[in-house]
Amino acid sequence: MSTAIYYSTHNNMHTNDDITNGSGSTTSGNPGANPSNPNHTNAGATINNNSNIGLNSANKNHTTLLPSLAHIMPSNSNNTTNSGSSIDISSTLINPYSSGAAAAAAAVGGGNGGYYHPPPPHSQQQQQQQFDTSYSNQTTPTSAYTNFNNDSTHSPTDISMQQNMNNLASSSGNMSIGGGIDGNFSHNNNNNNNNNNNNNNKCICKSKVNKIPRPRNAFILFRQKYHQMVLDEGTVIRTNPEVSRELGRRWRGLSPQEKEHWNNLAEEEKKNHAKKYPGYRYTPRRNGRNKNCPVCKNKPLPNNKSNSISGMSGSGGGGGSISGASSLSGGLTSRDNSITNANAIDYQQQQLQQQQQQQQQQAIQFQSLPPDQYQQLIKQQQQQLQLQAQLNGGGGGGGITSNPQTIPQYITNGNYPSYIISPNPYSTTSTTAPTTTTTTTTNASSIGLSVPPTATTTSTSSQPTSANSQLHFYEAEKLSPVSSTHHQSSISEIAAQQQQQQQQQQFMYNTNYSTIPPNNTTTMQQHSAGTGNDYSLNGNNSGNTGYDNRYGYGQPMIITGQSQQGLQVQQQGQHYNSGLHAAQHYQQQQQQHHQQQPPQ
């Protein structure tokens, strides 16, 4: 659609213009024509409506009188309503749904006899597009501002500015009306909510209309009699608590005859109250709370009312208490005494089941750990058990020894064959002989040779570890029958053999018949990690019989990349499995050695 609009920049009124509406869109004007001729055809508009769709009529010419508001409104005198005009004030500048649409249409639409015809809704978008196109054409350089056929005295810039202001005014008016309604509505809602909250938060305990007052006693009657008198004295007493304090001091200073007078008045008051309210019974509020009052029902209970559960506060007497029971009893309190003892016992059982499940999970995790970490975790568990025993153990031996349920299941579930729980469960203990766990000890301080710490081992059955001795996991009679019978005899025999070995070692190393070079001993001491071959010092690998092969009964195995603790376990298992047989073999070797020595 091609639309061209021509405005005049002068103040002259031009009429009697010839306009040809067709495909050519040509106009001609006579500036010097008679201005008194009021008849003109489509003044100030040249329109080609052949391409418009959805309009009522095309190429329609209206002949109307010039309205009196021509100098006020920036529009043409002929308002071509629904005719595809590029400047349609009634359809584009005025919102048909606003409150002032009818008045504006009556003022503008002079060509239609003062009637306003709102456009259909489906044509508003097309008309808005036409208005945008006409506005862009007004601002383009192709628009020639010449003296052609325009009755308006305003420039195109003024017209566009005023049109934009009208649009903003109409839209802002609607927005202000809606905003005011919404704002008032929200304000009213807020006020209603605040009023409801205030009503809900009011205490209704003292505002009961039908509540029967209590009969007054002697002091209340005395205070009501002299309350105003104390205020009238003009002293520093001003408040009700001060008045009550002063009257209480005076009440205590009354004579018995005067108190008898007030007591008689109180008795009479009570009789009259009983006659007036025959079924009255004083019912105080329980625990200082009123269930019907929205404020008082949420008040906390006094400290003396919050009783703990009596069934959970066991002291461990008689040795039957569980370690976690006393710890649970401290945190379980009943605010309104709704939890019963049965519920508390159920809760305790649930807690115990959870603890057992956690212990089973820990046992599975511990079994997959290496020996070093396993030993550390065992020590930590034992320390925790000892602390719990000290905290929870009461009278009658309520410690760990009397509470078998506190022992973790990974200790007592029978994963290990013996009653003795060694620090390292991966150590191999042989059960071929009754005294296999009992080994000999050599006093390295009395000998000139430095022996590694793994060589000095103790009897695990007679000298248990500190953790085992504290937990008392075993007793002497609980061991195997053979070991329990030979327990004392084996210890005495080993002590005698140790003394004999020490005497022989002192004699041997003090003489010059030792075949061990001293340099090898120092190099062995300086070695940081050890070689695993510490006990075969004199050609034991080559098959020669040296004097120190008493430590290695059998060929030792060298394992590299092993920890010191692993070496200790291995050496204990390899070098001391024979028990007393190793000591007997050593005695035979010593006898052969003394026979081969030359006389001194």
From Swiss-Prot:
- Which GO cellular component term is one of those annotated? nucleus
Comp. bias (Basic residues): 272-289
- Cite the InterPro entries for this sequence: HMG_box_dom, HMG_box_dom_sf, SRY-related_HMG-box_TF-like
Keywords in alphabetical order: DNA-binding, Nucleus, Repressor, Transcription, Transcription regulation, Virulence
The Gene Ontology terms for molecular function here are: DNA-binding transcription activator activity; DNA-binding transcription activator activity, RNA polymerase II-specific; DNA-binding transcription factor activity; double-stranded DNA binding; RNA polymerase II cis-regulatory region sequence-specific DNA binding
Q: What happens when the gene is disrupted?
A: Leads to constitutive hyphal growth and avirulence in a mouse model.
Q: Where is the composition biased (Gly residues)?
A: 313-322
* Main subcellular location of this protein, as a coarse class: nucleus
Provide the protein's localization: Nucleus
Record bears the keyword Flavoprotein: no
Specify the DNA-binding region ranges: 212-281
Q: List the disulfide bonds.
A: none
Q: What induces it?
A: Expression is regulated by WOR1.
| Compositionally skewed regions (Low complexity) per UniProt | 20-39, 47-59, 188-200, 297-312, 427-470, 497-506, 564-574, 581-600
An example Pfam family from this entry, by short name, is HMG_box
Q: Which GO terms describe its biological process?
A: cell differentiation; cellular response to starvation; filamentous growth; filamentous growth of a population of unicellular organisms; filamentous growth of a population of unicellular organisms in response to biotic stimulus; filamentous growth of a population of unicellular organisms in response to starvation; negative regulation of DNA-templated transcription; negative regulation of filamentous growth of a population of unicellular organisms
- What are the Polar residues biased-composition ranges? 1-14, 131-160, 481-496, 507-547
Could you tell me what this protein does? Transcription regulator that functions in both the positive and negative regulation of filamentous growth, depending upon the environmental conditions. Recruits the TUP1/SSN6 general repression complex to achieve repression. Regulates genes encoding cell wall components that are specifically expressed in the filamentous forms such as HWP1, RBT1, HYR1, ECE1, ALS1, RBT4 and RBT5.
What is this protein called in UniProt? Answer: Repressor of filamentous growth 1
Please spell out the taxonomic lineage of the organism that makes this protein: Eukaryota, Fungi, Dikarya, Ascomycota, Saccharomycotina
